[in-house]
Amino acid sequence: MKINKDEVEKVALLARLELTGEEAEMFTGQMDAILAYVDKLNELNTDGIVPTAHAVPMENAFRADEVRDSIGIDNALANAPKRAESFFRVPKVIE
């Protein structure tokens, strides 16, 4: 598949990018090379190959939950600029 400068400029417009003429020419060549590589990949015979989403067949590996001692409220709030009882006090951001 061949891409031309007009198509690159259209993609840039859709992406809200402002390209100079020189950049459009450069990206035309780069995108053309990328699409040529994709065309080459499309020529591969993938019959009998199982589609995969990940290279490693691994699912989430969670550790078992275990109860631990916490650092405590006083230690957690020790470096807080402002605090109110056992809470961080932060500036109001919503009116």
From Swiss-Prot:
Gene3D superfamilies, per database record: Glu-tRNAGln amidotransferase C subunit, N-terminal domain
Subunit description: Heterotrimer of A, B and C subunits.
Record family assignment: Belongs to the GatC family.
Keyword terms, alphabetized: ATP-binding, Ligase, Nucleotide-binding, Protein biosynthesis
Domain of life: Bacteria
EC id: 6.3.5.-
Pfam families: GatC
Group of enzyme by EC: ligase
The keyword Metal-binding is assigned to this record: no
Role this protein plays: Allows the formation of correctly charged Asn-tRNA(Asn) or Gln-tRNA(Gln) through the transamidation of misacylated Asp-tRNA(Asn) or Glu-tRNA(Gln) in organisms which lack either or both of asparaginyl-tRNA or glutaminyl-tRNA synthetases. The reaction takes place in the presence of glutamine and ATP through an activated phospho-Asp-tRNA(Asn) or phospho-Glu-tRNA(Gln).
This protein's name: Aspartyl/glutamyl-tRNA(Asn/Gln) amidotransferase subunit C
Family matches, as SUPFAM superfamilies: Glu-tRNAGln amidotransferase C subunit
One GO biological process term: glutaminyl-tRNAGln biosynthesis via transamidation
Catalytic activity: L-glutamyl-tRNA(Gln) + L-glutamine + ATP + H2O = L-glutaminyl-tRNA(Gln) + L-glutamate + ADP + phosphate + H(+); L-aspartyl-tRNA(Asn) + L-glutamine + ATP + H2O = L-asparaginyl-tRNA(Asn) + L-glutamate + ADP + phosphate + 2 H(+)
Organism expressing this protein natively: Geotalea daltonii (strain DSM 22248 / JCM 15807 / FRC-32) (Geobacter daltonii)
Molecular function via GO: asparaginyl-tRNA synthase (glutamine-hydrolyzing) activity; ATP binding; glutaminyl-tRNA synthase (glutamine-hydrolyzing) activity
